[in-house]
Amino acid sequence: MALTLEELVKRFGGEIAGDAQCKVGGLAPLDQAGPQQLAFLANPKYLSQVESTRAGAVLIAPKDLEKLGAAAQGRTAGPRNFIVTPNPYAYFARVAQMFIDLATPPRAAGVHPSATIDPAAKVAATAVIGPHVTIEAGAVIEDGVQLDANVFVGRGTTIGAGSHFYPNASVYHGCKVGPRAIVHAGAVIGSDGFGFAPDFVGDGDARTGSWVKIPQVGGVTIGPDVEIGANTTIDRGAMADTVIEECVKIDNQVQIGHNCRIGAYTVIAGSAGIAGSTTIGRHCMIGGAAGIAGHVTLGDYVIITAKSGVSKSLPKAGIYTSAFPAVDHGEWNKSAALVRNLDKLRERIKALEAALAAQGGTDA
């Protein structure tokens, strides 16, 4: 289905520079778009691609359109039509969602014959329950929820209206998932937190005893508009709930330990690990494979770059990095050798300073 720029602006705002009746039926990158497609410029370093693109129209910020100059709407090469908006990237995302919705017919409400639903569960008539879904006693499935094949919903758990669980996602007992959640395949919500009490006597080979499992009797509370990536795990709390606040976006294969609280609008990239009882503020960004120790607090607007390790609280907004960027292997070996000898070098410097001070050559 193609829409005119005028129709897009009526839905999403912005201003048209060019032909308001130009029709676009999809989106594509600047260097691949054709005359019936809409492209976008989110980074001014790609401005040269705007000049050569074959796109029918381009989403662009006002300052970037100005950079194109007076010829932007009069040249024979490149686009002549623009939707001018302060945030082309977000505009692109909304248009993309619209095109997907238009191209994807809604699934008919109902329960697949192979699904297993406890009589004590409550499932809205507008819900879509796929093959081999299991819903235990006391669970509540609200309006418009879609549970794909093999989804498991534990006893007493609530799934908020309009949520979508992809195949093989699981949410254990006693959890609350807010409206419009998106939970991707293989994600697990509410598994036991990693809680074990040491009960050992003696040392070395004479040591006896074991680890005693601590029952995890809390749950998981997830706010509205949260997205959880494939194979991500969110552990239930030991006593109080683990909490994921509204509009948090979590990538694939992320581990969130028990009793964590993740603040609203925070994003967490793939393979990050967050140990138990850690609080992350609002609007934070956690890079891929970052590791955050337990019982620490990150303030609002904290950014942790990829592969960084956080071992203490960071209350102040800012960008924090501890990862070592990749370098040539030989250079790395030289640096590693220097690091191993830092203590010896420090002692030599102290000795030299002391000798110079004794000779009156410098202040120690």
UniProtKB/Swiss-Prot annotation:
<comment type="similarity">
    <text>Belongs to the transferase hexapeptide repeat family. LpxD subfamily.</text>
</comment>
<feature type="active site" description="Proton acceptor">
    <location>
        <position position="258"/>
    </location>
</feature>
<dbReference type="InterPro" id="IPR020573">
    <property type="entry name" value="UDP_GlcNAc_AcTrfase_non-rep"/>
</dbReference>
<dbReference type="InterPro" id="IPR007691">
    <property type="entry name" value="LpxD"/>
</dbReference>
<dbReference type="InterPro" id="IPR001451">
    <property type="entry name" value="Hexapep"/>
</dbReference>
<protein>
    <recommendedName>
        <fullName>UDP-3-O-acylglucosamine N-acyltransferase</fullName>
        <ecNumber>2.3.1.191</ecNumber>
    </recommendedName>
</protein>
<dbReference type="InterPro" id="IPR011004">
    <property type="entry name" value="Trimer_LpxA-like_sf"/>
</dbReference>
<dbReference type="GO" id="GO:0009245">
    <property type="term" value="P:lipid A biosynthetic process"/>
</dbReference>
<dbReference type="Pfam" id="PF00132">
    <property type="entry name" value="Hexapep"/>
</dbReference>
<keyword id="KW-0443">Lipid metabolism</keyword>
<keyword id="KW-0677">Repeat</keyword>
<keyword id="KW-0444">Lipid biosynthesis</keyword>
<comment type="subunit">
    <text>Homotrimer.</text>
</comment>
<dbReference type="Pfam" id="PF14602">
    <property type="entry name" value="Hexapep_2"/>
</dbReference>
<keyword id="KW-0012">Acyltransferase</keyword>
<dbReference type="GO" id="GO:0016410">
    <property type="term" value="F:N-acyltransferase activity"/>
</dbReference>
<dbReference type="GO" id="GO:0016020">
    <property type="term" value="C:membrane"/>
</dbReference>
<comment type="pathway">
    <text>Bacterial outer membrane biogenesis; LPS lipid A biosynthesis.</text>
</comment>
<keyword id="KW-0808">Transferase</keyword>
<dbReference type="Pfam" id="PF04613">
    <property type="entry name" value="LpxD"/>
</dbReference>
<comment type="function">
    <text>Catalyzes the N-acylation of UDP-3-O-acylglucosamine using 3-hydroxyacyl-ACP as the acyl donor. Is involved in the biosynthesis of lipid A, a phosphorylated glycolipid that anchors the lipopolysaccharide to the outer membrane of the cell.</text>
</comment>
<keyword id="KW-0441">Lipid A biosynthesis</keyword>
<dbReference type="InterPro" id="IPR018357">
    <property type="entry name" value="Hexapep_transf_CS"/>
</dbReference>
